[in-house]
Amino acid sequence: MNGEIRLIPYVTNEQIMDVNELPEGIKVIKAPEMWAKGVKGKNIKVAVLDTGCDTSHPDLKNQIIGGKNFTDDDGGKEDAISDYNGHGTHVAGTIAANDSNGGIAGVAPEASLLIVKVLGGENGSGQYEWIINGINYAVEQKVDIISMSLGGPSDVPELKEAVKNAVKNGVLVVCAAGNEGDGDERTEELSYPAAYNEVIAVGSVSVARELSEFSNANKEIDLVAPGENILSTLPNKKYGKLTGTSMAAPHVSGALALIKSYEEESFQRKLSESEVFAQLIRRTLPLDIAKTLAGNGFLYLTAPDELAEKAEQSHLLTL
């Protein structure tokens, strides 16, 4: 297992000290409409496998239920999950920043976050073994969702096994598709673990649903979400706008927390990983973009409601 895995590279658009607004990405995927139904991801556990997290950030501290360090940062201390890069803190905020104290809100503001530090240093890189151990730890902790905005060029059998084992245990595994794209649907760019069929691979679009040129193309892309100029939390009580498929993936992880919570209440039972995935795909809008780039389309949490409304209107018109 030579080589390393890295955070999916991202662009820092700006850093901001003081914020009190709902990020555009949260609005355009229709998360607030789910909140209006009383669904905010309560009792859903999301493991964030990344560069760690600023656990004292006011928008995050009440959502974090624990964590573990698998890197050699801080002498490898298991409870040292500080974020020396900012990437992990930003991803965590998009998933579940609390909505009750100003600042920003994440997609699922009442979901619980397990911080699994698998990427170290200021540049956010890690060994395959760290990622594999992090996935296995998240499964042991009985999380509902694993969110990974990381990837590498190598298809490592042990990594695939860890992912398959997570899915077998009912965990939804979400991964950023990667930023090696060239905007051409015919050329494939593969980043692992996103390129594994078992993973929910997320590409990036703008909030106007235009494809991000950097978003990877391949046959395993499942859907796209906002990944450009995404406002979220950064270390030291700051906020910032970042760009990349790294920012798109946590929108889907947060959305899955809402969907799982809502649908299990509706069905009055636990849903399997494949059942929750089916409910996610119901909540997408097809785009006029090749499936190798956009998969099933754009994450849109109210899609079933709007379809039902249209059907009702056309039914009335035919009466």
Swiss-Prot record:
One GO term of the biological process aspect: proteolysis
Biological classification of the source: Bacteria, Bacillati, Bacillota, Bacilli, Bacillales
Gene that this sequence comes from: isp
Entry GO CC: cytoplasm
SUPFAM superfamilies, A to Z: Subtilisin-like
Subcellular location(s) per record: Cytoplasm
Main localization category: cytoplasm
Name by which UniProt lists this protein: Major intracellular serine protease
One example GO MF annotation: serine-type endopeptidase activity
Domain Peptidase S8: 23-307
Assigned protein family: Belongs to the peptidase S8 family.
Propiece residues: 1-17
Active site, renumbered: D50 (charge relay system), H87 (charge relay system), S246 (charge relay system)
Keyword Transit peptide: no
EC number(s) from the headed UniProt entry: 3.4.21.-
Entry-linked InterPro entries: Peptidase_S8/S53_dom, Peptidase_S8/S53_dom_sf, Peptidase_S8/S53_subtilisin, Peptidase_S8_Asp-AS, Peptidase_S8_His-AS, Peptidase_S8_Ser-AS, Peptidase_S8_subtilisin-rel, Subtilisin_Carlsberg-like
Task performed by this protein: Major intracellular protease produced by Bacillus subtilis.
Taxonomic source organism: Bacillus subtilis (strain 168)
Key words of the record: Cytoplasm, Hydrolase, Protease, Serine protease, Zymogen
Subunit structure: Homodimer.
Domain of life of the native organism: Bacteria
One Pfam family here: Peptidase_S8
